[in-house]
Amino acid sequence: MYSIKMRASKNGKHISGAERIVEKEKIEEVVKDLTKRALNHENGTPDFINIKVEKIVGEIEYIDHLPIITIPCKNIKEARKKAIEILINEGIPKEIILQAFEIIDRGGMRGAALLNLKGERLDPDKERGVRVKNIDVSESLKNEILTKNLGTERTVDAIAIASKVIHLGVLAELCTSDNKNYTTGYVATKKGYFRITNLKREGDPGGRVFFIKDDRNIKKLIEKLENKPCIIR
């Protein structure tokens, strides 16, 4: 199996990224698909596209996906109230949740901010954040999401990240899309992947925050988030 990673930017600013884990025979097809995706992104046409193909060394872990729950909300106020409610139920203080919203509303990070329950940033590079890599979803899960109207192509990408991070012991995740016109975001916990409509305003940037328990070994967690190969099924 091979990992294929795509990253696209313009004037040094991140536009889009995607990743797949595939058999050798599918490399050419997937590289073409990811290139097309980079060139046709709503955030603009990139002046730099990087595609990296690597043979996976070591065992791939297969992880069951989080249950997918969609919560329709009329506006950002209602959506954020619901997100806060879900996160408080996981034991996260409200002031820390509001701090997380401030981080994602600033945008600009390629990865996720790591925030403990004291409000301390744990990611080593505050500009970059921590990127969850070496992930994909099974074809059967992708087809189920798209054919049963459980979500969109963006849901397919997001469920991979959310399921991996929760499996590895992250307490919860809060995310809004860096696609400026896509306003549905999500909260992920061990109880599920909660798609919440109108979690940000159209045109606003997006971001991602992982809430971390204070007793976690951060170095070990980051290493697994970035390097442990996982396929979500």
Curated annotation (Swiss-Prot):
InterPro entries: BioW. NCBIfam families: bioW, PRK01322.1. One of its GO terms (biological process) is biotin biosynthetic process. GO terms for molecular function: 6-carboxyhexanoate-CoA ligase activity; ATP binding; magnesium ion binding. Catalyzes the transformation of pimelate into pimeloyl-CoA with concomitant hydrolysis of ATP to AMP. Its EC number is 6.2.1.14. It is an enzyme of class 6 (ligase). Belongs to the BioW family. Keywords: ATP-binding, Biotin biosynthesis, Ligase, Magnesium, Nucleotide-binding. This is 6-carboxyhexanoate--CoA ligase. Homodimer. It catalyses: heptanedioate + ATP + CoA = 6-carboxyhexanoyl-CoA + AMP + diphosphate. It comes from Methanocaldococcus vulcanius (strain ATCC 700851 / DSM 12094 / M7). Pfam families: BioW. Its cofactor is Mg(2+). Pathway: Metabolic intermediate metabolism; pimeloyl-CoA biosynthesis; pimeloyl-CoA from pimelate: step 1/1.
